[in-house]
Amino acid sequence: MTQQPKIPRATAKRLPIYFRYLTFLHDAGKERISSSELSEAIKFDAATIRRDFSYFGALGKRGYGYDVKALLDFFANVLDQDSLINVALIGAGNLGQALLNFNFHQSSNMRIAAAFDADEKRTGTILSGVPIYSMEELQEQITAQRINIAILTVPQGVAQEITNQLVETGVKGILNFTPVRVTVPTGVRVQNVDLTNELQTLVYFIENYGSITTGL
């Protein structure tokens, strides 16, 4: 993957959405699309889409719009879709098992390659094709499988401790489903996913603004 320009975090979060919809358009046989058509489909305003795309140079032509195949190929490169990305899942409880069952079915280049849990009843088993290892095997397996991204779905009381272990193994990115805001050193990125917060935010918007669709 070629080096990409620095872009705002909000733009980066929209890139997979663009890629997913462009994949849908390409599979449907559509050859070109305008920013206004794209806006209507994915519910981001056209100005935001044009601004996002402008960070990468001239991706479209005035009066023509965007070539779907060219744009799809471009974002596939930006998102490194040609490389298989192995991900570790830490915590194979209810949420962890749901993620294992899903295992990125909408993405061809990401997969949960290994899961880890402290419960001896779960370790040594295979769930949805993914082996579940003990926590004692964490460093060995992450190193052997060259994993640098982990999903954290553990009890909040051990979230920081396990985060420290992940950092020691060389993990560079953590998708954190726990309510704890874990601390990591420079060079490690954490993305927090708090379902309770998301639902509370949704309720707030519904009660105060109605059911207006909002983008990222």
Curated annotation (Swiss-Prot):
What do we know about how this protein assembles, alone or with others? Answer: Homodimer.
| UniProt-recorded name of the protein | Redox-sensing transcriptional repressor Rex
Q: Which GO terms describe its molecular function?
A: DNA binding; DNA-binding transcription factor activity
Is the keyword Hydrolase in the record? no
Task: Please give the superkingdom of this protein's source.
Answer: Bacteria
- Name of the gene this protein is made from: rex
- InterPro entries the UniProt entry points to: CoA-bd, NAD(P)-bd_dom_sf, Rex_DNA-bd_C_dom, Tscrpt_rep_Rex, WH-like_DNA-bd_sf, WH_DNA-bd_sf
Which residues hold NAD(+)?
Answer: 91-96
Q: Where does the UniProt entry say this protein principally localizes? A: cytoplasm
